[in-house]
Amino acid sequence: MFQNIPPITRNIIIINIVVYLVTNLFNTEFLYDILSGYYPFSPKFHSWQIITHMFMHARWDEAGIGPMHIIFNMLTLWSFGPALEQTLGEKRYVILYFLSGIGSYLLFNLWSFVEVQQYFAELQSVNVDVKNFMNSLINSPNNTYITHDAEKGLARIYYGKMLGASGAVFGVVAGFATLYPNAKLVFMFIPFPIKAKILLPIIIIASVFLGLGGNVGGIAHFAHVGGALVGFILASIWKKHLYRLN
């Protein structure tokens, strides 16, 4: 199954599958807590999560998504990764993949920071003592009394997990679309082929639109945007040095 997949793409897929099986078979919340990505000001944040969150995916018994989270990400990587890896070479491909994942984390949490400031302002407008609330939320979350929607939003940001390879995978898709803009892509849910150069702006615009509407269904849409932008920028820079594309 993996013999015809270039080594970096193959190893990334294998690592994701192994991590997924280990975290689900042992069903340990500890691994999800320390390896998933948290908001940088959350008490659950650790610096390594900027990388490790890329290898974590929704539990297989999680309502609404389950194993489709990792299946969709790995199928997408399997579809676009090999051509990009062969074109860029292993070193550049690794750089693009991980910088896209890091970019997705940074943009998502930058937007979270903006949301936090909005929630602070909203609570202050109704005379909530924000300092005391945040002190309770950070130091004693299980005993924090939450009544306001803005308080719920802050709890979601500070204790919500960011996980999945989606940001890095979106970077791979964006890189592919940048280097192969006229490649015709076929999807089950689209009755006609679509060129890669058309797909890229569609997914970015759609992700921005959905992100502004909130993380619908628990999906970190701005993470997708961050990954896609990094993939596009890197591929655009490197494209100038690639004299022959197959």
What do these predicted regions represent?
Residues M1-N246:
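A detector for small-residue-rich transmembrane helices and their helix-helix packing motifs
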